[in-house]
Structure formats: C-alpha cells, structure tokens
C-alpha cells in the first residue's frame, strides 16, 4: 500500500512537469542548461531564507508557540520575496546571455528567445520547489500505513501531491509573466506576480482545511495559466491550429532559379 501511495502521489505531483520537460526541454541542450541554472538560483534563495528564519528562531523565545508560528509565516513571506528577487536576477543574467548569443551568431539572432527562456526558467523554479516541498512527504509514504490514526486527514498525501503540481505550474506561469513584465516595464504585472505568490504561500497555512487552501490555489493557477498563455502570444486560433495539427505556413518565398547550377559551356 505504501508503494502504491508513493508512486501515485509522485506521478500526480511531477507528472505534468516531467511531461513538459520531455516534450519541450530535454531535446535542446541550451534549454537544459537554463533549467539547471534556474534551479541553482532557486536553491540560493531558499538558503538565504533558511538562514534568516534560523537566526530569528534562535534570537527569540522558542517556548512561545504563538511567536514561533508567526515567525514561520514571516519566514515564508521572506522566502517568497527572495525567490522573486532571484527570479529578477536570473532574468538579468539571461538577458546578458541572450545578447552574447546574438552577437556570436551568424545572422545576429539568438538561438533561443526571451519567452522560451522565461518558460524554461519558470519550469526550473517550479520543479526544484516541488522537489523540496514534497520529497519528505513522499519518503513518509513508503513507511507504515499510519495516515489518519492520530486524527490526521487520510487525504494528506494526495492533497500534498496536487498542491505540489499546482505550485510547479504556477512557477512556470509566473516565469512567463514576470519576464514579459520586465521586458515591457510593466511594474503592475510584477506586483501581481509577487502578490499572487504571497497569496498562494499564505493559503497553505490553512491546511488541513484543504477546501479552503487547495481550491483557491487552483483558481489562482488557472488564472495565471490564462494570463501566461495570452502573454506568450496564444489565442483561440493557435489552439485550433494545434488541435488540428496544422503548422503555420511559411510566408517566405524561395527563388529556385537562383539555386540552379549554371549550364556548362
């Protein structure tokens, strides 16, 4: 039973992200590099947030449960803000790298666009965030079947898996919207990204009232997904084209007469 719960929750949590990785990232070495580098940036933000929380816990009264709970909420907010700061730092780094790649190419264009970088970096933030948020829970799932014996919810593992899947998708959407907002200097969009991230993090403190946390988080996920889709240039026509497996016709015209070999004398 433990193994079934483990594999089931793992597929729920990381199935969408793994599919996105295989289809859109794994075949391009440059995207893989961006994915790994983005995970490193997220890890640094987590390290700094952990240091801040660790110091605050040890300089305050550890016997005060209410104070420690407040510090936990404060630490989560600091972690969110640091993640967004490092997302911006990663955007700046990728922007410089994009300019360098464009200068080295023969046609003066970068082999990867900013939108593609935004998508891959967001996916990297989401995957590493999901791994750190659910890995201990999945490890416990392999243990003895004690879920719910002490009054805990029997849906703890399953809801944690669905929450992790939502967080991974949200980071992907946040990355697309965040990079586009930086490109167009839309500060209100940056504020909405940070605000929705803080809201999502705050909603997790409502657990184990999963109806009050999971449903709003998925509502935010759907909203951010639509926003990211429109930001990336999506439309109803593009959806219809993808469903019908049609490719956009190339508007360029090749003059074949210019490619003919001149006749020999």
UniProtKB/Swiss-Prot annotation:
The functional gamma-secretase complex is composed of at least four polypeptides: a presenilin homodimer (PSEN1 or PSEN2), nicastrin (NCSTN), APH1 (APH1A or APH1B) and PSENEN/PEN2. The keyword Endoplasmic reticulum applies. It comes from the Eukaryota. Its main location: endoplasmic reticulum. GO terms for biological process: amyloid precursor protein catabolic process; amyloid-beta formation; membrane protein ectodomain proteolysis; membrane protein intracellular domain proteolysis; metanephros development; Notch receptor processing; Notch signaling pathway; protein processing. This is Gamma-secretase subunit APH-1A. The gene is Aph1a. Residues 1-2, 53-68, 140-158, 208-213 are lumenal.
């Amino acid at each position: 039973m433990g193994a079934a719960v483990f594999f089931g929750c793992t597929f729920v949590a990381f199935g969408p992200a793994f599919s996105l990785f295989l289809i859109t990232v794994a075949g391009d070495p440059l995207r893989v590099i961006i994915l790994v580098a983005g995970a490193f940036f997220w890890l640094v933000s987590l390290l700094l947030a952990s240091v801040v929380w660790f110091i605050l816990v040890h300089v305050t009264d550890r016997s005060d449960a209410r104070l420690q709970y407040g510090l936990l909420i404060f630490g989560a907010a600091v972690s969110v803000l640091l993640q967004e700061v490092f997302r911006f730092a990663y955007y700046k780094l990728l922007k410089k790298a994009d300019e360098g790649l464009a200068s080295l190419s023969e046609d003066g264009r970068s082999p990867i666009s900013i939108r593609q970088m935004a998508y891959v970096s967001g996916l990297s933030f989401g995957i590493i965030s999901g791994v750190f948020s659910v890995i201990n829970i999945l490890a416990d799932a392999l243990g003895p079947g004690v879920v719910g014996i002490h009054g805990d919810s029997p849906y703890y593992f399953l809801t944690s898996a669905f929450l992790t899947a939502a967080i991974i998708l949200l980071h992907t959407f946040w990355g697309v919207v965040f990079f586009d907002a930086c490109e167009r200097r839309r500060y209100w969009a940056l504020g909405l990204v940070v605000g929705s991230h803080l809201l999502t993090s705050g909603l997790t403190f409502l657990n184990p009232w999963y109806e009050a946390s999971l449903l709003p988080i998925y509502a935010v996920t759907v909203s951010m997904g639509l926003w990211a889709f429109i930001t990336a240039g999506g439309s109803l026509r593009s959806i219809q084209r993808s469903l019908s497996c049609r490719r956009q016709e190339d508007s360029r015209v090749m003059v074949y007469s210019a490619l003919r070999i001149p006749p020999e004398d």
